[in-house]
Curated annotation (Swiss-Prot):
One of its GO terms (biological process) is centrosome cycle. Residues 497-545 are annotated as: Disordered. It comes from the Eukaryota. The keyword Ribonucleoprotein does not apply. GO terms for molecular function: microtubule minus-end binding. Interacts with WRAP73. Belongs to an adhesion system, which plays a role in the organization of homotypic, interneuronal and heterotypic cell-cell adherens junctions (AJs). Involved in cell movement. Acts as a centrosome maturation factor, probably by maintaining the integrity of the pericentriolar material and proper microtubule nucleation at mitotic spindle poles. The function seems to implicate at least in part WRAP73; the SSX2IP:WRAP73 complex is proposed to act as regulator of spindle anchoring at the mitotic centrosome. Residues 106-287, 358-442 form a coiled coil. This is Afadin- and alpha-actinin-binding protein B. The gene is ssx2ip-b. The keyword Cytoplasm applies. It comes from Xenopus laevis (African clawed frog). Keywords: Cell adhesion, Cell junction, Coiled coil, Cytoplasm, Cytoskeleton, Microtubule. Belongs to the ADIP family.
Length: 545
């Protein structure tokens, strides 16, 4: 009996043999078992059976075949001397073994073919999995972009709703102002109608009183007409006709006079309202333009309503001279308030010695810069966290190559972002320097503008001719000098024109500093133009301010 011997192979040899067998084609598999079997059989023949132990080998093979289920290969000899080999049994056993070997080889080939199919399916599934993973990543990025776009659209929608709400409020305010103005206009029309009726009745009374108290001298020797025609006889009909014509002429004259007075009154009211609005805008301490526009409307409407109420109460009882005096006194009061306020501004018009930018603007700009730096820091922290998460995730054998590719792409993209960040940082530093220079230049411009404004206001208030013109008008009125509406209107326009020329000449003669045009300088120019237009405004009594 021979001993069983087991051959132990290293794990690397097994793996190489397994991998080589997997990658072999079925045709090579069909040919390879025969060669390997031949090699192994030749080794077993030379190692297992020799001439010395042939009997023992035959006995061992017979026992093994019987244990497997084959018939014995030895038969008893007829002589009874011993056992001999039975060739038929040996051939049958060999044939059966060959059949089983061929079946095992076919089953092995089938298993190997199935293994190849399974490996191919596995690779296909891995490729599908990787493609689905890439699609999922792209879908996730697209979803994030859509969410960001949705958020921006919602913010824009909220801003538009807020603007719509503000516009509706403005429309409501304007509608209320229009309604109040319409009611004031209706009241003024009714008041004018009542005044017209009263003046008509008073005119009729004056004419009738003069007719009753008329003292005349009859002409005995009447001089003939220049054309040589005879004069008509004076009868009751001719007298009535002449009186009617006289009344018609008087009524036409009074109507024309009333129309002219109404036109002049409307113009003077417009000038007065404009002056009051400008006074209120100057006297108000609001800083921003929106607040100023919102505050001028209600305050001016209140003042106009007060003035309209006072004029409604006193206009029917006072004459034109009294109304003019009342308007002049109100304008004087407003100008006194304006003068005191301008003197205060003149005292406060001295700017800082350094002429630097205001502290509030500087702090606001610093706050913006700090917010931008904080956002950059947060972005860098988020990127670092993402990089740590990517490095901390355990790598599988299948995803190592893909992770390396992703890391290379992320590294390149990060380098590009760093380059862009450095460029933005340089641009930001450049803009910061430009802003500092512009702030310094703006401080100098503001200082120069305040000096010019203080000097100009001082010159204007020192050369005011409101009270002197008013005294001259009172002296002329005391001496009985009266002007017709046409003469008053011409005098008004001539003084307006002269005053406008004088003020424009003063502006042109005064030296100015040439500075670069900035938003603040544009605002200062608009303020100067508005002040010059206010100087060319005219008071109701014919004097200019």
């Amino acid at each position: 009996m021979g001993d069983w011997r087991t051959i132990s192979l290293p794990e690397s040899d097994k793996i190489l043999q397994y991998s080589s067998e997997i990658r072999m084609s079925p045709t090579s598999l069909l040919s390879s078992p025969s060669h390997s079997a031949a090699n192994t059989l030749s080794g077993i023949v030379y190692n297992f059976c020799t001439e010395d132990n042939i009997e023992q080998c035959i006995t061992y093979i017979d026992q093994e075949l019987r244990t497997i289920g084959f018939p014995t290969v030895q038969a008893v000899s007829k002589n009874g001397d011993g056992r001999k080999l039975h060739l038929v049994s040996i051939v049958n056993c060999i044939h059966e073994l060959l059949q089983r070997n061929s079946q095992n080889m076919r089953s092995k080939e089938e298993v190997e073919t199935q293994l190849l199919k399974i490996n191919g399916d596995l690779e296909h599934l891995q490729s599908i999995y990787q493609r689905q993973k890439d699609q999922m990543e792209a879908t996730r990025r697209e979803n994030c972009a859509l969410q960001e776009r949705d958020r921006q659209m919602q913010c824009k929608n909220r801003n538009l709703l807020q603007l719509l709400k503000n516009e509706k409020e403005e429309v409501q305010k304007l509608q209320n102002i229009i309604a109040s103005r319409s009611t004031q206009f209706n009241h003024s029309v009714k008041r004018k109608e009542r005044e017209y009726n009263k003046l008509k009745e008073r005119l009729y009374q004056l004419v009738m009183d003069k007719r009753d108290k008329k003292i005349s001298i009859d002409v005995l020797n009447y001089v003939g007409r220049a054309d040589g025609k005879r004069t008509s006889w004076r009868t009751g009909k001719t007298d009535a006709k002449n009186e009617e014509e006289m009344y018609k002429v008087l009524l036409n004259d009074y109507e024309q006079r009333q129309k002219q007075l109404m036109v002049e009154n409307a113009e003077l009211k417009k000038v007065l309202q404009q002056m009051k609005k400008e006074m209120i805008s100057i006297l108000s301490q609001r800083k921003t333009k929106e607040k100023l526009d919102d505050s001028i409307g209600p305050v001016a409407s209140d003042i106009e309503e007060d003035l309209a109420d006072s004029s409604k109460e006193n206009l029917s009882e006072l004459s034109c001279e009294a109304v003019r005096e009342q308007l002049v006194s109100s304008i004087r009061q407003q100008w006194r308030i304006l003068k005191s306020h301008m003197e205060k501004l003149d005292n406060q018009a001295t700017p800082d010695e350094n002429g630097m930018i205001a502290r509030g603007d500087h702090e606001q700009e610093l706050g913006k810069l700090i917010n931008e730096i904080q956002q950059c820091k947060e972005t860098i922290k988020i990127q670092q966290q993402l990089l740590k998460q990517q490095f901390s995730v355990p790598r599988d054998d299948t995803s190592t190559l893909l992770q390396d590719c992703y890391l290379l792409e992320d590294k390149e993209r990060l380098q590009e972002e760093w380059k862009l960040f450095n460029e933005q940082k340089k641009n930001f530093e450049k803009e910061r320097r430009n802003f500092t220079e512009a702030a310094i230049r703006l401080g100098h411009e503001k200082k120069a503008f305040e000096e010019d404004r203080a000097a100009w206001l001082k010159h204007q208030f020192l050369n005011m001719t409101v009270f002197t013109d008013h005294k001259n008008s009172e002296e002329k009125r005391a001496h009985g000098v009266h002007f017709s509406p046409e003469q008053d209107h011409c005098r008004l326009h001539s003084r307006t024109h002269d005053r406008h020329l004088a003020s424009s000449g003063d502006h042109y003669q005064r030296p100015r500093k040439t500075l670069p045009i900035t938003p603040s300088s544009k605002h200062s120019l608009t303020q100067r133009e508005s002040v010059a237009w206010r100087d060319s405004s005219i008071s109701p009594n014919g004097t200019d301010f």
